[in-house]
Amino acid sequence: RSGITQLLTTERIRVIDTASLSVKDIRENALYQPVRYVKPDTTLGIATKPFKAVIIGFGDTGQELFKFLYEFSAMVYAKDISTPFECFIIDPKAKVLEQELLSKCPGIRHDKDSLHFMCGRTEDFSREWEALIKEVDYIAVCTNSSEGNLSLGMQLLDMAYRLRDADKTLSIFTGIYDTVKFANASYIADYYRQHTTQGAQTELFRFELVPFGKREDIFSYANVLQEETIERAKSFHYEYQKTKLYKYGGKTEQDPEKEWTKRAEEFMQEGMSGKAKITQQEI
């Protein structure tokens, strides 16, 4: 019983990494993996074009996106591709952030030539954007302003329609944090999608606007509590079984995980009534 008491009285402090959770859906969606954009040769198992990305706003969320893109762009590329991964990071504090990144992640110094930090305030920057929009595969707009992110994302999408080849895939991710604003952004993204598709299958343009980072989803039960709650339930069930001498004689499996699995198997053997006692996550 002391084990049960300890489980119930242990104080818990949970630190929520909102930046990491903001990009979770992007990271876990196969459609948004860098491999989609590099024209993979499935016969040879290599990428036939480099992967180029732009990150606008290099705060916590921008840095999480960079980590994801840097890690998942590590593929086998064709021999004639000298710079397989390029990332353009645009932030008013570009120079300071560049030094901070290199000090935190010294391992990327050998890839320094692939990283381009830009403040975005020069007079020639509009011309630089016109060149970038023709070539990059992936744009993430993640400043602190939902309205600003959506507005800039739409401007970049319109620029792509004017300047970019229609068959070159481009995804523009916009950080939208408020629930109502996220719904509006999703409506706008669907509008663009519907009006750049001919019939049910034919895409006139391979460009898309993708909102991400809704706070309501970030602080959901599934993200914040589900895993911890199930683990505590396993431990509680294990300790509780030890007290049920009349049924098990104090004998349990070797660890909470095995005892939990045995519980699920027993319920499944009971048929539908037993299945109703098991949560969907367990099944």
Regions found by a protein language model. Give the residues of each.
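Cytosolic regulatory regions of ion transport systems
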Residues: R1-I283
